[in-house]
Amino acid sequence: GGMQKRVGIARAIALNPKYLFCDEPNSGLDPYTSILIDRLISDLTKEFNMTTVVNTHDMNSILEIGDKIGFISKGSLLWQGDRHTILKTDCQELRDFVCANTLARNIIEGK
């Protein structure tokens, strides 16, 4: 999984593009490998001075990679800002998304 993602990213940047689009770069990866891929994308974006667009539902990736973040729902841009203001938004749909994708990871099922 992780090696295939790295190879895909390497192939995408081989021609030194101005733009890189990553569609769900962490899908199917374990949490540790996801962090490595996020850092790789972030580092390469800076090193090659390219604009990177990442389509993801992974809150950790959003906060790790995103300098500027856009929240799109049903084809409409509902919010845009940076990682420092994402939790201060008035956009209820975005707040619901953040809660669902953050709090759910911290719940341990029991009897």
Which sequence ranges carry the predicted segments?
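Catalytic Walker B motif of ABC-type/P-loop ATPase nucleotide-binding domains
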Residues: 20-23
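A short, proline-enriched helix->beta-strand linker immediately N-terminal to the Walker B motif
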Residues: 14-18
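Helix N-cap at the start of a conserved alpha-helix in ABC-type nucleotide-binding domains
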Residues: 31-33
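H-loop/switch region of ABC-family ATPase nucleotide-binding domains
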Residues: 56-57
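A short, surface-exposed alpha-helical micro-motif characterized by mixed small hydrophobic
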Residues: 62-64
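C-terminal boundary and immediately downstream tail of ABC-type ATPase nucleotide-binding domains
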Residues: 87-111
